[in-house]
Amino acid sequence: LDKFNDPKIREAIGLMFNFEWSNKTLFFGLYDRVTSFWENSAMQASGRISKEELAILNPLKKYLPESIFSDPVFIPPTSKPDKVDRKNRRKAIKLFQDAGWDLADGKLKNKKGDIFSLEILNYSPAFDRIINPFIENLKLLGIEAKHTRIDSTQYTERVRNFEWEIITSTYGNSLTPGIELVQQYSSKTADVPSRNLVGLKNEGIDILINLAANATTRKELNEIIRSLDRSLRSLHIWVPQWYKKVHTVAYRDHYSYPKNLPPFDLGAFDFWWFDKEKAEILNNK
């Protein structure tokens, strides 16, 4: 949609989702904010661009935001635990103004007098408690925002036909990314039903996907994906949500396991074993 073409608009909308309030009020403080498309992995971009990433991204400069080369990688700002973070609201209003929208009579309007509106489409009642406060914050910004909940069949049909503005979804990426990146981020899949939900079309991203698919070493792949992560985050195509960086498991304490477990796998069915001594201690209590 044309109204979301300016990345300033997309960034401003994202500023109005208060993760810290949601985490404290709704999630018992159990989660961390997602900041990366490859969160908590060796492929997550961090800080300022490295010399290795610069070598990859320099030839693509004309396709990507200048901020990639001048600023640290984008991380959503931390909000105060109050429902509305006034600092982020002021920043969001400034971004809208820079994109040609001004506050008039409590509404964000362009030079034609059109009011900025948006709809968040949802099919799960479980997400009402998350979406509704976000809607309220967007209204405080001067946006005519609404939350529409429909059944899953209608939802699937509307998503496939691109009849939506904002939805809730996940970007589940592989730890060994390759040709499947075309389905999620390539211009080739922007106009057809695919995992490229936002219809992303960027020649620089397309080139990075091709580089990743043809990487020959793990080190090379990691550098390319860090470059891709940095680039995607600069485009503000999402409002990052949350994740849990640890496994939470309840178990009877008669098992043992290796000191060093795989980084992303609990290994309960692969590496744990029944410990007779622990079982005897437990049974004697």
Enumerate the language-model features and the residues they cover:
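Short helix-loop capping/hinge motifs at secondary-structure junctions, enriched
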Residues: 1-9, 102, 214-215
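Immediate post-signal peptide segment of exported/extracytoplasmic ligand-binding proteins
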Residues: 7, 89-119
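Noncatalytic alpha-helical scaffolds and linker/capping helices
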Residues: 10, 138-139
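Detector for C-terminal structural segments
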Residues: 14-76, 90-93, 126-136, 158-285
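Hydrophobic alpha-helical membrane-insertion segments
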Residues: 77-87
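Short, well-ordered beta-strand elements
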Residues: 114-124, 145-148
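Short glycine-rich hinge loops at helix-strand junctions in the catalytic core
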Residues: 142
